[in-house]
Amino acid sequence: TWAVASVHGEAARLRALHAKLSERIRADENLVYLGNILGHGDAVGDAVEELLSFRRALLARPGGEFRSIVYLRGSQEEMWQKLLQIQFATDPREVLQWMLDRGVGATLEAYGGSAEEGVVAATKGPVALTEWTGNLRDAMRARDGHNALMSAICHAARTEDGTFLFVHAGLDTERSLAQQTDNFWWGAGGFEEITAPYGGFSKLVRGFDRRHPGIEVAAFTATVDGGCGFGGPLLAACFDGDGELVDTLEA
């Protein structure tokens, strides 16, 4: 299984990584994007286009379809979905500023919006906000495949044999998968301190860590995050059926 770290709108790095990955990945392997395709970088829309293009290229290869290509919901995708419903927030200006402080502005700009427009709409009230978010939705729908991709992202992904659980930022080991909610995209802390299997899975793999440590592999966990979007490279890691790291890529 190949796992791709947070992209954060770095379309050029994603394109370069895909060029390398296309020479390595086999049809009997899974491909998991660990969230945060959106946000921070200056080419969010192009990054989504590259995702869709690479998927089409893989599925068009002779010799059958790939086992699985999965996209996880990261904190950026979660914020974007919440932003599109911001007219229902108790304090939309405060919520918008909170999101802007965490990188959602890049996604706003990718779909024709701006922070300034949002602040003005929030000041005017729910009707103006509804019109503003409606325009953002229309802009996303106008780009073929973008809306469908956002509708298809998963909270977490597991391999059929139960070896792996893939998450965006972490989880709370005291809670079941159904109880995780925001822990998936914001993390619960202590991920690197997990010292026992969770939920019967041999390995937990995440694609975002605020430390951006690169690739860290422990007995029961793995982190894949080189800081793409924050000045670092985009990473991908390949794990075998036993949970061992067997290959890495960087762009």
Q: Where on the chain are the PLM-derived regions?
A:
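Feature recognizes metal-dependent phosphohydrolase scaffolds
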Residues: T1-A251
